[in-house]
Amino acid sequence: QKKALSCRGLVMFGDEASFWLDGSLHRTWARVGVQPHVDTFGMRKTAHVFGAVSVEERPRFRYLFAPVFNGDTFLIFLKHLVKRSRRKLFLILDNGPCHNLKDDGKAWLGRNRHRIELFRLPPYSPNYNPTEGAWKETKKRTTHNRFFRTTDERDAALVGTFTAFQSNPVLLAGHVARFI
């Protein structure tokens, strides 16, 4: 954060999450003796999403759908973040294998060092990443106890939640507060 403050940069935490077409049964109300039920197709058609949350009083949320998680799609996400920020980004990530860039990605990162720097969290420390809270909130608002007939329907619900995060930053403020 000191480095970011010295150059008026923006600290963001990044992560990726998958959302299945199948709904997930989560804590809910039901009549006594009746098991809650969520319809399902039995298919795991997955939406892969990269996301990043800024460490500010009014956190910003950026996201990008990807066909798969790998170094190539991660590079596309980095370019997406840089394109949408006027300030230098300090992106903090976990050690997921998809965050490993190939040679062309490393070269791009070197050429854009004045716009973005990457930092790694210690292994097995998701509690240090507020983006995990954004994913938890997304699943709570979007996929728990819901049945989607199509991937388009699920993706539209996800975009609706992400848009709510962007237009109402207070939804993520609780996940970011301890990092400010």
Can you annotate each of these PLM segments?
Residues 1-180:
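Short functional hotspots at interaction and active-site rims
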